Amino acid sequence: MENLRFLSVSLQLAARLASLGCRRFVGAGTCFEYEPSPGYLAENCSTGPSSLYAATKLGCYLALEQLSKLMGMEVTWLRFFYLFGPYEDERRLVPSVICSLLKDQEAKVTRGDQIRDFLHVEDMAAAICAVAQSHLTGVVNIGSGQPVTVRDLVSKIGEILDRQKLIKLGALPYSGSEPMSICADNSRLTQNTQWVPRYNLEHGLRHTVEWWQLHLASHPSQEWEGLPGA
């Protein structure tokens, strides 16, 4: 029930800030608040969370909207899509494939037909700063706006490391709750801020591979689980 605790704490924090005269609150949501659908997801698309995590994120935003009306504090809600980069939990897709290949182990994945929107974590941080410095309120998507299949993503990692044969597409089944397509329409972000991503997908993956090479070389026996809350 940690998600419910985070919901309560977040709303208490926002209410306290509003009572102290805070004029704007920027919160972190998730793309999983949306109802999955083919094509690009814009901020006005239907919501339909299918997990407690996503439901509490959406609930937090809806409650913040009402708090905004009551206390006069503007609310900006960032919906993050798929992120990758240094310090990510090794059990997640990009680092798990990279680490398996660096250890000369098979990287077992699904058939990889899922369409995703991946953004390097440094570009995410820059987007947060850009939105914070803008006048945007309401929901803002934080994503690359560039769809890629999981198959192409992991194949690119294999190509970078020259270990394509270790990638085993179709070795894992699809998750029943996994959306097959999720990609951001990030036009609200790009048209209303100065944000321009520094990394394209290949550049970001190469940067991430280099980080993991250094990390595994300096921590050869350590199981990395990322930063707290990652």
Predicted regions and their residues:
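NAD(P)H-binding glycine-rich loop region in Rossmannoid oxidoreductase-like domains
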Residues: 1-5
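Conserved active-site helix of classical SDR/Rossmann-fold NAD(P)-dependent CH-OH oxidoreductases
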Residues: 10-11, 15, 54, 58-65, ...
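Conserved Rossmann-fold NAD(P)-dependent oxidoreductase catalytic core, especially the SDR/UDP-sugar
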Residues: 11-52
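Conserved sequence/active-site signature of Rossmann-fold short-chain dehydrogenase/reductase
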Residues: 31-33, 83-85, 114, 124
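Flexible, glycine-rich beta-alpha linker
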Residues: 34, 51, 76-93
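Active-site Tyr-X1-5-Lys
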Residues: 37, 48-76, 102
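C-terminal substrate-binding subdomain of Rossmann-fold SDR/epimerase-dehydratase oxidoreductases
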Residues: 101-230
